[in-house]
Curated annotation (Swiss-Prot):
InterPro entries: ZC2HC1A/B-like, Znf_C2HC_C3H. Disulfide bonds: none annotated. It comes from the Eukaryota. Belongs to the ZC2HC1 family. Residues 46-56 have a biased composition (Basic and acidic residues). A zinc finger (C2HC/C3H-type) spans 13-42, 128-157. Residues 187-199, 233-245, 255-267 have a biased composition (Polar residues). GO terms for molecular function: zinc ion binding. The keyword Metal-binding applies. This is Zinc finger C2HC domain-containing protein 1A.
Length: 327
């Protein structure tokens, strides 16, 4: 690359600008003079950050910062009178300070002696502060102007809410001594409706009350007894749609009133059941007369309150808590 030879410095003299006083070359000065005249004619305003921050708020006491000029400062001082200075309350503040010190010393002495504490000194208020007529608090001049407007709006809102609350009906008192309802008993309407569909306890079964389940009722509504040494026949266990009631719990060997009225039908059904039982009963069932072979099929309804079991594996009733019966 070829080296660029530096030109020797020119011997032109610098000419000062008449407006700003800076010195330029004659060629550059021709361009600078019109620009310098425009800038001198248009003075830039001093940026006031306080006024920008106060825009959009309730603060209107921000004063713009004025540029201080030596020529204008002397004339402004002579024209505008100074605002009167506030009288200092140094004597009053001094007396309050001495009173607080004396009160603190007296309290320390009483604590050492073990006597009763004296009452606290009365509160002192600054007379320069302005008291709010709504909340009775005191603020400075600038703060009081902002606070009183806000406090007035808040007080009007609270008064409107109290009027609306007073016009409404009084609320009922809270039930602090609330007790949950007792669980349903056997004599509830649901249990009575379920038990009405089932065969009632016979006269003989009510007197005995042994609690041993007998054979299932037939389609005619009569309950048959089984011979000694045989377990009751249980057919169509899956077709059980209604819960067994206490009326089904009959002692062995007891006959209902309906079967006594119709002896012919009862005898015929007993013969059929005995024949079926001879085919199904094993030798292990013949050992003890009181042994019953219960299967694992559970009832679909609770025998106490008639509520249907929600799950097949439920062992207790979800309504009354009675243990589930198995057939």
């Amino acid at each position: 690359m070829e080296e660029i030879e530096e030109s020797p410095p020119t011997s032109e003299e610098l000419v000062p600008c008449k407006i700003c006083g800076r010195s330029f070359f004659p060629k550059v000065l021709k361009k600078h003079v019109p620009i310098c005249q425009k800038t001198a004619a248009k003075r830039r305003k001093v940026f006031d950050s306080g006024r920008q921050r106060a825009e959009g708020t309730e603060i209107s006491t921000v004063k713009p910062i004025k540029p201080k000029l030596q020529s204008s400062s002397s004339s402004s001082k002579s024209d505008k009178p100074e605002p009167p200075k506030k009288q200092s309350n140094w004597r009053r503040k001094h007396e309050e300070f001495i009173a607080t010190i004396r009160a603190a010393k007296s309290i320390n002495q009483v604590i050492k002696d073990g006597g009763p504490l004296p009452p606290p000194p009365p509160p002192s208020y600054d007379p320069d502060y302005i008291q709010c007529p709504y909340c009775q608090r005191r603020f400075g001049e600038n703060a009081a102007d902002r606070h009183i407007k806000f406090c007035k709006e808040q007080a009007s809102r609270i008064s409107n809410k109290s009027k609306l609350a007073g016009g409404d009906k009084t609320k009922p008192p809270a039930r602090t001594q609330y007790k949950p309802p007792a669980p349903k008993k056997a004599n509830s309407p649901t249990a009575s409706s379920v038990s009405s569909r089932l065969p009632q306890r016979s006269a003989y079964g009510q007197g005995a009350g042994t609690g041993i389940p007998s054979s299932k009722p037939s389609s005619t509504g009569s309950i048959k007894s089984t011979p000694s040494g045989y377990s009751p026949l249980r057919n169509n266990s899956s077709s059980l749609t209604s819960p067994p009631s206490e009326g089904n719990m009959k002692p062995k060997g007891m006959v209902s009133q309906s079967s006594l009225r119709n002896p012919s039908t009862g005898i015929g059904m007993n013969k059929k059941k005995i024949q079926n039982a001879d085919n199904c009963i094993s030798r292990n069932d013949m050992k003890n007369e009181n042994d019953f072979n219960y299967s694992t099929t559970g009832t679909k309804f609770c025998h106490e309150c008639g509520t249907k079991y929600p799950v097949e594996s439920a062992k207790f009733c979800c309504e009354c808590g009675v243990k589930r019966m198995y057939i």
